[in-house]
């Protein structure tokens, strides 16, 4: 594969029957009627348009051409099933395509594209080997390289994917396409393992790739000191004056040049300090105050249960607030997001609605089960598992967590997690046992409280698949009431937890333990208050510097999509009746 990826623009592949047929013709003009010629060009219409054209035409050759164009656009639109169905229909008429090498070539190309999209690398590679790059139009050649890049991405071979996309960059003239390609390259590099990137090297003459590797190295070295980022990137520009990113900078990096360090002198803290949620607001405020200590920043405190959100926002702004922190309750967050009062002020909401919307100047932070579930998916993938079974209680917590895990798992692996909901924990053991064929590289993410988790663990141990599944779970099962018997029964189970509760010897733990009367749920809220202060003081960094992170009491914090603060949590494991940190 590496040999194929490194071939230059005019390299020829092993001839096949198709290429022999093409080379036997002195000219392809025999096959280029006004419709067939479209195959060699960009396809600008929608898949629906080409499907309709295929249904309307009476000419068999034109029908095939329109179907090929439809498959191409269905792939672009990520409509895998529809693309495969249309391709299957075309396969039944290969005898007609044998009369038209242009259609044969396009058929091979879209077959490879679709195989790569579906993650079938072997089929995609074999099909590409049967295509001669010299016979491709410029539009087709770009798709040829994009398919190679997709194969590399499927294989988690970041450097090869970037190498191919660097080659694509030299072939693009449309600025929109150049921007999309550079954004994709940057996304691959930003999400790659830093150790792997540090050891990667470009080959002789690969200046485009060398430039990308140098740029990501500068970025990663500067991300913790964002104020130095523009100067360091300008230095990179002088080293690579002809690089494609110089003309079309990745979208993420464009924000870096407008970065201004966060400087606070007046903030408004909106919490429920009366009513049913008073106890929650008070412990969060205590964590916030303890983290702030003697900092001179003015903090205006507002009780969201004693006044309307609209009035509070107006008053806070009149009193000079630069930032709104809060509210905590979802209903209040929704009211705030609907207000025009937040259009010209930064906001750190302490909760997120189900469908977080991107709003300029707004970030979302909280101890949501979704954030922890996404962290769980990250952990299973990092530990090398390629298949995940999720068991969750059939309640709001279980459904929210399972759906968030599944969404992240799909992003990480391009496969679906096997989700199973239960009313009684033991119900799900039977279904897993009956459907278990091959559990290699499979892990179980079990969601529930301590009692439910215990039933699941013991049920698995008494089943025919005992010992075949690594078990992971979330912090909900971790309670100060879990004694030695529970910890012994949980042998080998790994669970996520906030850093505060992972280190019982820290001063922060001792303080929170005392304030919360040993209630882990309240201790988590104390930690949230502490991290809220830290986030507020680095608000611009999180908004404008992708990858910026800080270590907090609730996790390693970074900004995800729509400035939704993600938490990379500490992982612990039950071993010999105790709890220990796991790498």
From Swiss-Prot:
Record's bilayer topology term: Lipid-anchor
Annotated lipid attachment (S-diacylglycerol cysteine): 25
Keywords: Cell outer membrane, Cell shape, Lipoprotein, Membrane, Palmitate, Peptidoglycan synthesis, Signal
Protein's GO biological process: peptidoglycan biosynthetic process; regulation of cell shape
InterPro entries on file: LpoA, Peripla_BP_I, TPR-like_helical_dom_sf
Keyword Cell wall biogenesis/degradation: no
Gene Ontology CC terms: periplasmic side of cell outer membrane
Entry-linked Pfam families: LppC
CDD domains: PBP1_YraM_LppC_lipoprotein-like (cd06339)
Family listed: Belongs to the LpoA family.
Quaternary data: Interacts with PBP1a.
Function recorded in the entry: Regulator of peptidoglycan synthesis that is essential for the function of penicillin-binding protein 1A (PBP1a).
Protein name: Penicillin-binding protein activator LpoA
Gene: lpoA
């Amino acid at each position: 594969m590496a040999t194929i990826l490194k071939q230059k623009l005019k390299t020829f592949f092993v001839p096949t029957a198709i290429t022999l047929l093409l080379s036997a013709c002195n000219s392809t003009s025999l096959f280029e009627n006004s419709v067939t010629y479209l195959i060699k060009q960009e396809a600008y219409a929608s898949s629906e348009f080409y499907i309709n054209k295929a249904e309307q035409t009476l000419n068999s050759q034109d029908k095939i051409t329109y179907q090929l164009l439809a498959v191409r656009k269905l792939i672009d639109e990520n409509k895998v099933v529809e693309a495969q169905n249309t391709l299957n229909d075309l396969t039944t008429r290969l005898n007609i395509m044998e009369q038209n090498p242009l259609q044969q070539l396009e058929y091979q190309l879209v077959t490879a594209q679709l195989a790569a999209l579906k993650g079938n690398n072997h089929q995609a590679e074999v099909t590409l080997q049967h295509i001669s790059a010299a016979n491709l139009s410029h539009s087709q050649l770009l798709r040829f390289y994009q398919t190679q890049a997709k194969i590399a991405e499927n294989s988690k071979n970041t450097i090869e994917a970037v190498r191919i996309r660097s080659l694509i960059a030299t072939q693009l003239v449309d600025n929109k396409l150049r921007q999309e390609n550079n954004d994709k390259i940057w996304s691959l590099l930003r999400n790659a393992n830093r150790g792997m990137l540090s050891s990667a090297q470009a080959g002789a003459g690969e200046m485009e790739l060398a430039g990308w590797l140098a740029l990501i190295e500068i970025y990663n070295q500067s991300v913790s000191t964002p104020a130095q980022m523009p100067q360091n990137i300008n230095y990179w520009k002088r080293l690579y004056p002809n690089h494609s990113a110089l003309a079309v900078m990745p979208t993420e990096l464009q924000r870096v040049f407008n970065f201004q360090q966060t400087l606070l002198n007046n903030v408004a803290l909106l919490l429920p300090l009366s009513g049913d949620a008073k106890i929650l607001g008070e412990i969060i405020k205590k964590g916030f105050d303890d983290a702030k200590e003697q900092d001179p920043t003015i903090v205006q405190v507002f009780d969201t249960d004693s006044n309307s959100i609209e009035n509070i926002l107006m008053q806070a702004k009149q009193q000079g607030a630069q930032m709104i922190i809060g509210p905590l309750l979802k209903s209040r967050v929704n009211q705030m997001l609907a207000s025009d009062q937040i259009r010209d002020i930064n906001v750190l909401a302490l909760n997120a609605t189900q469908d977080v919307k991107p709003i300029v100047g707004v970030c979302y932070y909280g101890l949501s089960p979704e954030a922890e579930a996404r962290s769980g998916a990250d952990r299973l993938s990092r530990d090398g598992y390629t298949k995940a079974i999720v068991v969750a209680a059939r309640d709001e917590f279980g459904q929210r967590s399972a759906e968030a895990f599944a969404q992240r798992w799909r992003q990480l692996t391009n496969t679906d997690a096997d989700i199973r909901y239960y009313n009684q924990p033991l119900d799900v053991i039977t279904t897993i046992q009956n459907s278990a064929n091959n559990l290699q590289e499979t892990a179980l993410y079990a969601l529930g409280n301590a009692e439910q988790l215990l039933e699941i663990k013991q049920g698995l141990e008494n089943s025919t698949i005992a010992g075949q599944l690594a078990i992971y779970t979330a912090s909900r099962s971790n309670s100060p009431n879990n004694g030695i018997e529970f910890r012994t029964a949980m042998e080998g189970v790994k669970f996520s937890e906030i850093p505060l509760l992972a280190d019982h010897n820290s001063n922060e733990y001792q303080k929170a333990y005392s304030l919360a009367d040993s209630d882990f749920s309240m201790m988590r809220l104390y930690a949230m208050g502490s991290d809220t202060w830290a986030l507020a003081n680095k608000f611009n960094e999180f908004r404008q510097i992708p990858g910026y992170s800080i270590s907090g009491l609730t996790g390693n914090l970074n900004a995800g999509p729509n400035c939704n603060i993600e938490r990379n949590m500490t992982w612990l494991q039950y071993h010999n009746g105790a709890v220990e940190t796991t790498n």
